[in-house]
A protein has these predicted regions:
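Short, conserved active-site loops that position catalytic residues or coordinate cofactors/metal ions
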Residues: 27-36, 55-59, 198, 225-239, ...
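A short, flexible N-terminal coil/short beta segment enriched in small residues
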Residues: 160-186, 318, 326, 332-344
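Metal-dependent active-site segment of extracytoplasmic phospho-/sulfohydrolases and closely related
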Residues: 260-262, 430
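Membrane-embedded alpha-helical bundles of multi-pass enzymes
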Residues: 1-182, 421, 428, 433-434
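Membrane-interface segments at or immediately adjacent to transmembrane helices
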Residues: 173-260, 269-275, 288-294
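Solvent-exposed soluble domains appended to multi-pass membrane proteins
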Residues: 236, 241-243, 250-255, 269-435
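Flexible, charged surface loops at secondary-structure boundaries
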Residues: 43, 72, 188-189, 221-225, ...
C-alpha cells in the first residue's frame, strides 16, 4: 500500500471517528478509543497534526451552534471551536514518531494525559478515555488503564522487538473486555427514595419564568414521597436571603418530612453592599401578580411600563457568582462547580462570572451517600470525573441546564458519557436536565 493511500485512509478514519463521537451515542464514544491509532499512523508529524485536528473539528462541530447560543456570537463560537481543536491536537502531534515499538507506547499515554489534565483538560472534550466504561464495564481503574494502553499497544505491533510483549498484552485486554461484559452484574439502581427530576422550563433567568419554575418545583416536592429530590442546574438563578424567604415554606415542609431538596442555584459571591434585611425587603417589593400576568401574556404584546425604575434584582444579578448544587431541607450543604464553561462562565481576566475551583471537593455527602456531582459542562470533560472517583463516591449525579443546546447532540453525549463512567466504576447514576 502506498504512503499516499495509507495517509488518505488514516485521514478518513480520523474524520469518521470524530463524526461518530459527535452524535453522542455510546457506539461513537467506543469508536473514538481508536483515535490515537488514526492520528499517529501517518508518515510525518505534519500529517499527524492534520489527522488529529480533523478528528477534533469533526467531533466538536455541535459546539458551534451550542456556543453560539451561549456566547451570543457565532464568530466567537467558531473561533472557540477552531481554537479548541488546535490546542487539543498539539499533544498528539508532539507524540508522533516515525518509529514503532514500545517507546511509542509512553508517547501515546503522555499525550492522552495532557489532553485530560489541566490546563488542556479544561477544554478536554471527546477524550478517547471516555469509552472505557463501555469497553471494560465494572473494572474501574484497571479498565481505565487498559483503555489508555490499548492504542499504544496496537501501534507497537509493526515492531518485531515488541511483538512478544504485544502478544501477551493484547489477548489479556481482549480477555478483560470479554470477561467484564460476561461477568459484570446488572447496572446498580440509584439509592432508595432518590429521584432526579428533569424539567422543560427553558430559560428561567427572567423573573416570570423563574417564578413559574419555582412554583412547579415546589408543587413537585410537596407531592413527592421521595427522600432526596434532585433538580437541574440553575433552577434558581440567584439564591440569596430574598429567594430563601420565597422558598421558606417549601424548605420548612422538607425539614418536617425529612426530605432533602438538591437544586441547581447560583450563589452571589458578594452583594455589593446589599444587606440581608434589604434583600428580604426586595422579596416584599416584588410584584408576583405581575409575574403571573407575564406568564399569560406574550411579552411582545405587553406594553412597557411608563417608569420602570431600577431593577430590584440588578445588584444581585450583576455580581460574580458560584454555580452550585444547593442542598436544603433535612440537610444543608453546598456543592460548588469546579470547572465552569471557559469565557462564557469562567472569565479569568474579569471579576465577573464563575470562579475556577480545581481543588474543590468532587464529592458531597447526602442522605448517607457520597455523591460525585458533575454540573453541566463538567460532564463532557474527563478531569472532573476522574478527580471525583479518587474520592470513592457511591453514586454519580449529573445536573445540567441545556435548553440552549436542545437542537444539538450535546445533551445526548453528556448522558452517554455519564453512563460510561458509572458503568466503568459500577456505581448508580442520576441525571436531572432542564430543556
Amino acid at each position: 500500500m502506498s504512503h499516499r493511500l495509507k495517509d488518505g485512509l488514516s485521514l478518513c478514519s480520523a474524520v469518521a471517528l470524530g463524526m461518530a463521537i459527535s452524535t453522542g451515542y455510546p457506539a461513537g464514544i467506543v469508536a473514538a478509543v481508536g483515535m490515537p491509532i488514526a492520528c499517529l499512523t501517518p508518515a510525518s508529524r505534519k500529517l499527524a497534526f492534520r489527522n488529529t485536528i480533523s478528528y477534533y473539528l469533526a467531533g466538536l462541530w455541535p459546539m458551534v451552534s451550542g456556543a453560539g447560543h451561549f456566547t451570543g456570537s457565532v464568530p466567537i463560537a467558531i473561533l472557540f471551536w477552531a481554537g479548541t481543536a488546535t490546542l487539543l491536537s498539539a499533544p498528539w502531534a508532539l507524540a508522533w514518531t516515525p518509529k514503532r515499538g514500545l517507546h511509542c507506547l509512553w508517547r501515546v499515554i503522555l499525550a492522552g494525559i495532557a489532553g485530560i489534565a489541566p490546563p488542556l483538560g479544561l477544554i478536554g472534550f471527546i477524550s478517547p478515555m471516555t469509552g472505557a466504561g463501555y469497553l471494560f464495564p465494572g473494572t474501574g481503574w484497571a479498565g481505565l488503564a487498559a483503555t489508555a494502553l490499548l492504542p499504544g499497544i496496537i501501534l507497537a505491533l509493526p515492531d518485531s522487538r515488541s511483538r512478544i510483549c504485544v502478544r501477551l498484552a493484547l489477548p489479556a485486554m481482549v480477555a478483560l473486555a470479554v470477561g467484564s461484559h460476561s461477568l459484570a452484574p446488572p447496572e446498580p439502581r440509584p439509592p432508595a427514595n432518590w429521584i432526579a427530576v428533569s424539567t422543560h422550563f427553558g430559560d428561567v433567568s427572567r423573573p416570570s419564568q423563574e417564578f413559574a419554575a419555582a412554583q412547579s418545583i415546589q408543587q413537585t416536592v410537596a407531592a413527592s414521597s421521595a427522600r432526596v429530590l434532585i433538580f437541574p442546574e440553575a433552577m434558581v438563578p440567584r439564591w440569596s436571603n430574598a429567594t430563601r424567604e420565597f422558598w421558606r415554606q417549601t424548605l420548612a415542609h422538607c425539614r418536617a418530612r425529612g426530605q432533602i431538596l438538591a437544586i441547581g442555584a447560583g450563589l452571589p459571591r458578594n452583594t455589593v453592599g446589599t444587606t440581608a434585611a434589604a434583600e428580604v425587603d426586595l422579596v416584599k417589593q416584588y410584584d408576583f401578580a405581575a409575574a403571573i400576568r407575564a406568564l399569560q401574556v406574550d411579552d411582545h404584546e405587553s406594553p412597557p411600563p411608563a417608569n420602570p425604575g431600577p431593577d430590584p434584582n440588578a445588584s444581585i444579578n450583576a455580581d460574580p457568582f458560584e454555580n452550585t448544587l444547593l442542598i436544603q431541607g433535612a440537610e444543608s450543604s453546598t456543592f460548588y462547580q469546579r470547572v465552569p464553561v471557559p469565557i462564557g462562565m469562567w472569565q479569568p481576566f474579569s471579576k465577573r462570572g464563575v470562579p475556577l475551583r480545581l481543588n474543590s471537593p468532587g464529592v458531597i455527602r447526602m442522605d448517607g451517600q457520597r455523591a460525585a456531582v458533575l454540573i453541566c459542562y463538567e460532564q463532557v470533560l474527563t478531569y472532573p470525573i476522574v478527580a471525583s472517583m479518587l474520592q470513592s463516591p457511591t453514586v454519580l449525579v449529573g445536573i445540567s441546564n441545556m435548553y440552549w443546546f436542545a437542537d444539538t447532540p450535546i445533551p445526548r453525549y453528556q448522558e452517554s458519557a455519564l453512563r460510561a463512567w458509572a458503568k466503568l466504576f459500577h456505581i448508580p447514576y442520576l441525571v436531572a436536565e432542564n430543556s
